[in-house]
Amino acid sequence: MQYLVFDIETAPEPDDVLEGLFTFDESAVKNYRLLTTDFDPGEVKLGNMKDPAKIEAKIEAARLKFTMDKAAVTDQIETARMESWQTFQDRAALSPLTGRVLAIGWWNLDTSNTFVAHVDGETEPITENVLIENFLCMADAVLSDGGSLIGHNIIGFDFPFLLRRGLKFGIRPPKTIVNALAQYRPSNLIDTMREWQFGNRAEGFVKLDQLAAFFGTQRKTGDGADFHKKFFGTFEERQEALAYCRNDVVMTAEIAAKMRLIAMPAKQAAAQSESPPEPPKQEEPQREHNAAPTVAQQDDIY
């Protein structure tokens, strides 16, 4: 049986896109009502005051406090807006509505190599839609041939993300994948997170690195939240990001083997555990304009 282990890496949409999707309710900020009202001297509590000078002084003090409080609310709203925007940006990569696919790593256990295909802006870009369509075609072929797809939270995250982003580009979801996702426990989608739950879904999410620590297998080499920052950073940082994706694929395969979900040949496991060679620092060759690369043309992990 053919086994394909995979993992996707996502990023927030560009800021100009996110700005059109971001919403903020400033009325929820404390004392927001001050911005919609004017100072009313009649609301100042004077008690038994009789002295006009003291009355005027108290009213002026109240007016000054109202003005300062109103200015403070404006500052609070701006601070709250910035914090909300930052949270929105930080979580954007987790939703197909606000995020995009940057890279997909996979490993066909019948072979000895892992691969990472990714969008690329150095020359003619491999676009997100090409990346998704090529991978879904490959996944569909594996399932159609009776094989299985393996990943961590692929039922709850990876596949829904890929399929929904694919819809944005007019990519028809493969029936093999849709039908598998519709099953309570699809036999051809091996999700290490679901398998770890043993039916207790109320237990919630378990991180891949937690399972790696538990089983004593390869650990994370970075933080997924930093993937897009490194990917769009220097050449060296991009290589680190792609190596991180590759490592996640190997981690998943090792954990699946530890859970007795698959049998991974020892020599392949050992080969994948070795660090990839340092990539040569050279520019990529110019691609023919508008040429859509196939899966086979996607970049190896270097």
Positions of the model-derived regions?
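Intrinsic, low-complexity terminal and presequence regions
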Residues: K258, M264, P276-E278, E288
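Metal-dependent phosphoesterase core characteristic of DEDDh/y 3'-5' exonuclease domains
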Residues: Q2, T98-P125, L143-A266
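Short, glycine/acidic-rich hinge or "gate" loops at secondary-structure transitions
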Residues: F22, M264-Q272
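Compositionally biased non-globular segments, especially hydrophobic aliphatic-rich helices
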Residues: E60, L64-K65, Q272-E274, T294-V295
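Conserved non-catalytic scaffold segment of RNase H-like nuclease domains
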Residues: Y3-R164
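Compositionally biased, low-complexity segments enriched in small residues
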Residues: D51-K54, P277, Q286, N290
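Long, low-complexity, intrinsically disordered segments
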Residues: K281-Y302
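Short, mixed-charge aromatic SLiMs
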Residues: P125-V130, P277-E283
